[in-house]
Amino acid sequence: MSKDSVAKSKPHLPIMGVGPVYVISIILLSILAMIADKTHLHLPRPTSAPLEIFLFIVGLLFILSGLLIYFLAIKAKITSSIKENTLVTHGIYAVVRNPIYSAWLFICTGTLFLYGNPYLALMLFLIFWLSLTILMKHTEEKWLTKLYGEAYLEYCKKVNRCLPWFNKNNSPI
């Protein structure tokens, strides 16, 4: 029996994974941080028009990047691949292992830049990245390693977990 048919005969991963927990958490944290900053924290903000325009552009680029990543992930038809126990390593999955989660990280960070507070945006970006890293290491990465073994571990060596980047080893996946 081939490795593919063995994987297909195993129960598949949950379709949604831990995604809803992560996405809802970072959306709520973004909203709460903006409310807290407006009402209590009063973190310093840029006062020059060029810097405000720059932050707006950065925020817009983050949001557009997030939307593009999300669209490319949906286009990859990940749901059917999960049901078939197929490890997806092409398309957007060749540049980031968790594109849907990454898309939300970019969208929320972009929203914080549009809000106009670079300190809040950078601080929460790091929190979003760290929480995604911890969450993935302790959940989906364990599930995927158990399901795909060495193939998944090799994929992990070549492709970043959270932030889209070119293949680490410059080799085909």
Stretches found by the model and what they are:
Residues 1-90, 104-173:
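Membrane-anchoring alpha-helices and their flanking helix-loop junctions
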Residues 88-99:
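Short, amphipathic, aromatic/basic-enriched membrane-interface segments that mark the entry/exit
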